[in-house]
Amino acid sequence: MMDQILGTNFTYEGAKEVARGLEGFSAKLAVGYIATIFGLKYYMKDRKAFDLSTPLNIWNGILSTFSLLGFLFTFPTLLSVIRKDGFSHTYSHVSELYTDSTSGYWIFLWVISKIPELLDTVFIVLRKRPLIFMHWYHHALTGYYALVCYHEDAVHMVWVVWMNYIIHAFMYGYYLLKSLKVPIPPSVAQAITTSQMVQFAVAIFAQVHVSYKHYVEGVEGLAYSFRGTAIGFFMLTTYFYLWIQFYKEHYLKNGGKKYNLAKDQAKTQTKKAN
């Protein structure tokens, strides 16, 4: 297992075996994750919030850097496959995106990274910040989806992976700057949320198209998994719905929560200056 995770002897087939072996653990981990965060939330109810500024800044910096590297190591291969074999080939056939020792390894790392990313929620709970359904739901589900799709060759996931990498590079960088009290306009957060919805829409399109090619056109030899596609379609459509609701609440309704908060903070700073 460790030779695949560390990349010392990476092979796509070997990495798939690791993912297959982790599937059952991931399902149990999701249940344990939900129980843990709500147990911690109850424990913290009458206790003072932890500051955790330094470890949080380090965490956000690590995830932003990791995500940027993941994008840089996968995107050139994605462009190469599109130029050589066409756009649909990326989500309908196993290509060097998955088998290449660099791109393939970083796609595998993305799959594995969904496990440590669960720590995001621990920071939220221990700092007594609002814990919304959208947050813990997507953390609980994504890891299992990633492992199933990876070892069953449901390669539509590549459009989740590389877009998620670049979005997370900006998102965790944004969190880091916010934690450091750097003033950032709400439009940046809005752009990140918009890009996440675009990511879901593109991945849903890839799933629908490869399913059409498989069932309607009867194309043989596709990298298609009914289970991976079913889990993915359920996951991505529910994410898309939740993110739309979040977008409306925070950026559109009554001026948008984030924009109103920014205005209030600007007024407070003006009063202090006077």
From Swiss-Prot:
Known pathway: Lipid metabolism; fatty acid biosynthesis
Subcellular location: Membrane
Loss of function: phenotype: Loss of function induces an egg-laying defect from the second day of adulthood with progeny arrested at the larval stage L1. The small larvae maintain morphological integrity and survive for up to 3 to 4 days. Animals had reduced levels of isoheptadecanoate (C17iso) and isopentadecanoate (C15iso). The phenotype could be fully suppressed by feeding with C17iso and partially suppressed by feeding with C15iso.
Entry keyword annotation includes Lipid metabolism: yes
Protein origin, superkingdom: Eukaryota
Membrane topology qualifier: Multi-pass membrane protein
Pfam families for this protein: ELO
InterPro entries according to UniProt: ELO_fam
Residues annotated as transmembrane: 24-44, 62-82, 106-126, 130-150, 157-177, 188-208, 228-248
Membrane topology (Cytoplasmic): 45-61, 127-129, 178-187, 249-274
Tissue: Expressed in the gut and unidentified head cells.
EC number: 2.3.1.-
Reactions catalysed: 11-methyldodecanoyl-CoA + malonyl-CoA + H(+) = 3-oxoisopentadecanoyl-CoA + CO2 + CoA; isopentadecanoyl-CoA + malonyl-CoA + H(+) = 3-oxoisoheptadecanoyl-CoA + CO2 + CoA
UniProt keyword list: Fatty acid biosynthesis, Fatty acid metabolism, Lipid biosynthesis, Lipid metabolism, Membrane, Transferase, Transmembrane, Transmembrane helix
Cellular component, GO annotation: endoplasmic reticulum membrane
Single Gene Ontology BP annotation: very long-chain fatty acid biosynthetic process
One GO molecular-function entry: fatty acid elongase activity
Topological domains, Extracellular: 1-23, 83-105, 151-156, 209-227
Biological role: Catalyzes the first and rate-limiting reaction of the four reactions that constitute the long-chain fatty acids elongation cycle. Uses malonyl-CoA to add 2 carbons per cycle to the chain of long-chain fatty acids. Condensing enzyme required for the formation of isopentadecanoate (C15iso) and isoheptadecanoate (C17iso), both play critical roles in animal development and growth.
The family this protein is said to belong to: Belongs to the ELO family.
Protein's recorded name: Long chain fatty acid elongase 5
Organism for this UniProt entry: Caenorhabditis elegans
Gene: elo-5
